[in-house]
């Protein structure tokens, strides 16, 4: 379920905090006497309905595990005193500077964010050696949700696909234009959906700061299956910008729309992975009657192989598909609840 406390808000000072275009995410200082996490406490405060509430790490009760990855575990927790349910990303800091950078990047992006299409940040704590990033809890990731849909012999209707597209592109546009950030790991598992029909983007651990007029170079950040051609093409010197997120979005939408990943998954053969992306035609939605022409063209625009022909996320928001469908009635709330209820019953 979404957070039991729907009126949670960030502290006023965080809402008013000026956005920084000069944030530097670098290797933490080597001074062994000072850790980047030394200033974290075992509690934090947030404002809701005019009251300031305090969350203490020891008071949290774990409900279940929501996910697990290379950088830690995400748990659904409950705070009895405030009757608040949250998602907590629990990470054990190491001497690995890359993992430390990832954790700090995730934290700083969430702290600076004030976007309805990005998971809300409540606070951060340090307990028993673990950093605990407390966030809004959603019901399910889209990689799991679309599998539930197709397992039930249902289809993803275009009003649902519209909501997903509109939400994710708005999140990416906000990151790009307001925070100067490239997400770099856009995929269905980092898109979350709730019973209220809201779709939000999460996981900014490998996001990259993009200064005005600059391009990024790191190729190792993100899942290779969703990477844009320019991110893995050796002839481009691995230079890329916000348009690489657009490509990853397009690949994700084909997967969510059809229930199948558009490329063959060669789990151990890196060369075959790259060959598919670089030398095959860009994937496209099937012309089999399931999808409208405007939606198929919308996804096709996101998957232009030539980066100069591909729009940035904010530019793709102006597409005909999103404009035409904007005022159409959506059944996404009923659809999501129906799928999740039937899945729970199974």
Positions of predicted regions on the chain:
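Catalytic-loop of the protein kinase fold
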Residues: 176-193
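Conserved N-lobe beta3->alphaC-helix segment of eukaryotic protein kinase catalytic domains
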Residues: 90-113
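Activation segment signature within eukaryotic-like protein kinase domains
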Residues: 164-165
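Glycine-rich ATP phosphate-binding loop
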Residues: 73-93
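Conserved short submotifs of the Hanks-type protein kinase catalytic core
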Residues: 129-141
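A short, aromatic-enriched beta-strand patch in the conserved N-lobe beta-sheet
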Residues: 123-124
């Amino acid at each position: 379920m979404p957070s039991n406390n729907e009126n949670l808000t960030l502290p006023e000072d965080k809402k008013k905090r000026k956005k920084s275009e000069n944030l530097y995410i670098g290797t933490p200082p080597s001074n062994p006497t000072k850790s980047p996490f030394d200033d974290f406490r075992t509690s934090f405060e947030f404002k809701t309905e005019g009251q300031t509430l305090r969350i203490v790490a020891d008071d949290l009760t774990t409900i279940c595990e929501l996910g697990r990855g290379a950088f830690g575990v995400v748990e659904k927790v409950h705070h009895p005193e405030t009757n608040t349910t949250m998602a907590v990303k629990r990470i054990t800091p190491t001497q690995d500077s890359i993992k430390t950078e990832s954790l700090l990047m995730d934290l700083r992006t969430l702290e600076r964010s004030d976007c309805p299409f990005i998971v809300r940040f409540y606070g951060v704590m340090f307990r028993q050696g673990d950093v605990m990033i407390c966030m809004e809890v959603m019901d399910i990731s889209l990689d799991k949700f679309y599998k539930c849909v197709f397992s039930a012999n249902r289809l993803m209707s275009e009003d649902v696909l519209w909501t997903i597209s509109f939400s994710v592109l708005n999140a990416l546009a906000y990151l790009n234009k307001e925070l100067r950030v490239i997400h770099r790991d856009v995929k269905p598992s980092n898109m979350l959906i709730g019973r209220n029909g809201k779709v939000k983007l999460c996981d900014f651990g490998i996001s990259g700061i993009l200064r005005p007029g600059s391009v990024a170079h790191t190729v190792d950040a993100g899942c290779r299956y969703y990477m844009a051609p320019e991110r893995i093409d050796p002839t481009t010197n691995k230079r890329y910008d916000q348009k690489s997120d657009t490509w990853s979005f397009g690949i994700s939408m084909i997967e969510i729309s059809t229930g199948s990943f558009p490329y063959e998954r060669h789990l151990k053969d890196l060369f075959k992975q790259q060959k598919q992306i670089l030398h095959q035609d860009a994937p496209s939605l099937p012309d089999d009657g399931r999808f409208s022409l405007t939606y198929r063209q919308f996804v096709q625009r996101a998957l232009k192989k030539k980066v100069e022909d591909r729009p940035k996320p904010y530019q793709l928001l102006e597409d005909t598909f999103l404009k035409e469908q904007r005022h159409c009635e959506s059944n996404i709330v009923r659809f999501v609840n129906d799928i999740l209820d039937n899945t729970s019953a199974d």
